[in-house]
Amino acid sequence: MLSINLSLCAHKKGMGSSKNGRDSESKRLGVKASDGEFVLAGNIIVRQRGTKIHPGVNVGRGKDDTLFAKADGLVKFEKRGKDKKFASVYPVEIEQSVAE
């Protein structure tokens, strides 16, 4: 005689489980140096996706559209035309006091 032992398993997960509870890690985008702030060459000014703010004077653009300072100076956000925003860095002389 042929006998088959068939056991059935639940096809639903049961009470208490949820399909929620995941989220992606934040990317920490945004302005990192405000208008009028002194920055050193290489400092990040804006982290962004796409060019919402374009590079101006003494500002470079990384491959991920991050804007960074190419020279030491003060950050200035400017608007050119109707809808284009630019970030520039203007060099400034800093007096260094010598302790005697």
From Swiss-Prot:
Record-level GO BP terms: translation
Source species, domain of life: Bacteria
Keyword set, alphabetical order: Ribonucleoprotein, Ribosomal protein
GO molecular function: structural constituent of ribosome
Post-translational modification: The N-terminus is cleaved by ribosomal processing cysteine protease Prp.
CC per GO annotation: cytosolic large ribosomal subunit
Positions annotated as propeptide: 1-9
Family: Belongs to the bacterial ribosomal protein bL27 family.
PANTHER family: LARGE RIBOSOMAL SUBUNIT PROTEIN BL27M, RIBOSOMAL PROTEIN L27
Descriptive protein name: Large ribosomal subunit protein bL27
